[in-house]
Amino acid sequence: MELGCPELLEPPEDIFSTGSFLELGFNGPASKVPVTRGLQKSEPDDFLNLFIDPNMIHCSETSPGRDSGVSEDPGSPAQQASSSPALYEVVYDSGTLQGTQREAGPTFGLISIQIDQWTPALMVPDACTVSGLPSDSHRHILPRVSTRAPAPPAAMPSCQHHLFLTDEEKQLLAQEGITLPSHLPLTKAEERILKKIRRKIRNKQSAQDSRRRKKEYLDGLESRVAACSEQNQKLQRKVQELERQNIFLMEQVRQLQKLTAQTSSRAAQTSTCVLILLFSLALIILPSFSPFQGQSEARPEDYQLHGVISRNILTHENVTENLESPVLKSKLEELPEAPTTNGSTKTHLKMRVKARPPGQIRGMVHTDEM
């Protein structure tokens, strides 16, 4: 492509005219554009080099009060754009300018051209596309025909947002045979599919978590069961040992009971024997200690018989005859020989019997026998 024709340096009137800008929704530029003043036909090396950077192409909506061109007329009406047409920034080399701009070094400028339905492939070949601008310390920027500030990040369209999918989401989409675009926005059907896939992934993760927790719980239970079984075995062995010790102690207790029974029976026998001996000794020794032993024996003369209330026993006539019998006589003779304290009384009675009648003798004998 030969860029030596000077006609390419002058923009056509139908594109940069005020009417065309008003139709596109922008304020028209001034009648005299400073870009057109300037290039010599004798300098073919400084012709316009057209570079279009795809990274500088962006979509934005025109604000209601923003001017699309450099206009000195304050009374020009501001119109709102009904749509968001594409805005392309063209980088050109203006070369050495005549008149007031005769400094050394080339100058560069930017022209913002709004194209409604043109495509970059029809405008500029791929060979003219570069990713950067040449750097130069002596650079002069020409006034723009149309200046436009870049849109803020919030106003940037969603076409620049990429859709990031995880490997698991990609795998599930591939299994279901569904392909999603890599850029946003998505349609409602695609959003539903993506939500469904993510819901499946969440359910899968929750199921895995529940299975993991269940496995951990079961492992903990198994370890506790093993520890409890081991402790139970130890306790069983200890119980068996204690049972053996208990049996041994019971045998010893039985033997001790037998020994204590024998010793207790022997002790009871000895104690009873000792008590019997003491009681017999007491019976033998106590009668010798009489309270009347220290007194003098009573004489027959000192003893006086007093009247005693006694029973009157009926006697038979044969009793008087029995008194004369030798048996009674022998008894009466034996009375003085008895070693008793009342021997004197019996002797006195015997002495008095002879002087009394037979009836009185029978009464005295009866009282003596009583």
Swiss-Prot record:
The keyword Flavoprotein does not apply. It is found in: Endoplasmic reticulum membrane; Cytoplasmic vesicle, Secretory vesicle, Acrosome inner membrane. Residues 293-370 are lumenal. The chain crosses the membrane at residues 272-292. Its main location: endoplasmic reticulum. It is a single-pass type II membrane protein. Coiled coil: none annotated. Residues 1-55 are annotated as: Required for transcriptional activation. The keyword Transmembrane applies. Residues 76-85 have a biased composition (Low complexity). CDD domains: bZIP_CREB3. Changing residue 283 to P: Lowers translocation to the nucleus. It holds the Pfam family bZIP_1. Residues 1-271 are cytoplasmic. Residues 193-256 form the bZIP domain. One of its GO terms (cellular component) is endoplasmic reticulum. Glycans are attached at residues 318, 342. Binds DNA as a dimer. Forms a heterodimer with CREM isoform Tau. Belongs to the bZIP family. ATF subfamily. Transcriptional activator that may play a role in the unfolded protein response of the testis. Proposed to be involved in spermiogenesis. May be involved in regulating the maturation of sperm head nuclei. Alternatively proposed to be a paternally delivered transcription factor that may function in early zygotic gene activation. Increases the binding of CREM isoform Tau with CRE. The CREM isoform Tau-CREB3L4 heterodimer functions through CRE but not through UPRE and may recruit HIRA to CRE to regulate histone exchange. This is Cyclic AMP-responsive element-binding protein 3-like protein 4.
